[in-house]
């Protein structure tokens, strides 16, 4: 747990400006990217497809995830000294850690610089994902081990308030990986990945847990688990901006699924469509996984990460021999069916996170892992232009020093 005086000391360094080369054309969005406990801010030049590092802050432990307030005035970050950000690629055992927290920041409307507000909140275990509800009234946090959820009120000034008591025992599945709230603010989705089988035990079954949501209070509603959750390891989901379609990334299966949403927000029990995310599914390697996904703001395309890396006996990351790409799909606007139209090489390894800028003219992929010195592949931010047909054109990459921690999270946030 971090003391308030230490957090205040961290706050003093939030506005520290790092040296930079040339100021790009102004952008109404900023990119934030972590390297361990450091969270760096980059200015975006959309016309030149360029990033300029401007400042950074340091959190008490490795950044796990972050999410903006709907007003875009505030920004929330969760951190932990446990979990996969402290482990080698493919590791079967990861530290649980002792320092887990949630912090609130005010976003400078001109520059995107972050200023801490209020006191950080200690969390019970490693947070793996977080989001803010559509009303901007509550922040929801998902934990993978033990799989669980907490909700905190947000105060009028954007700072974090008290925990919201839940009235009953929540069905939080096995290995929660993402928590999202629908646009109507009435339904919460907890994506629980489960775990793949090992030589000693069968798989832990995956599911998408669905809760009713009333101002931060959750109530069990449904569990979506085709085939009883067997061979079903969902990681992340996203929503179509105008149609009642939910898109789901299956990690171990390297699949994209589409579900219909009823008027009350409940997904169908089985997918409408299931598609392969890899360019050549027959060549799938041992450490090949699907990652996060994002629907284009116009609803015509969806993007999904494919990830591959392994570690040697010393824990150093190596090329997994598989595919590190962003899969691009065109979405049929009448049926919701996705058609794979491109697998764009990310020019790095393990693109754990990626984001589109608000204009959807750029996509930036955060290649998490630096491969061994022999292979000479650095962790990096890879920048792509987005064509009108949804396909990606690689422009350049910016290496990220991960000597003190991996590029575990990055995102692009529109300024207030």
Where do the model's predicted regions map?
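Conserved beta-strand position repeated across blades of beta-propeller domains
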Residues: 67, 131, 180, 238, ...
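Short loop/turn segments immediately following beta-strands, especially the blade-tip
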Residues: 42-49, 105-112, 151-160, 210-218, ...
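Short loop/turn segments immediately following the C-termini of beta-strands
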Residues: 34-36, 80-82, 144-146, 154, ...
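Short, solvent-exposed loop/turn segments at conserved positions within beta-propeller repeat blades
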Residues: 33-35, 85-100, 142-147, 197-206, ...
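A short beta-strand motif characteristic of beta-propeller blades
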Residues: 52-58, 115-121, 163-169, 219-227, ...
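Residue-level detector of Asp-centered blade-edge/turn motifs that repeat once per structural unit
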Residues: 25-27, 70-72, 132-136, 182-185, ...
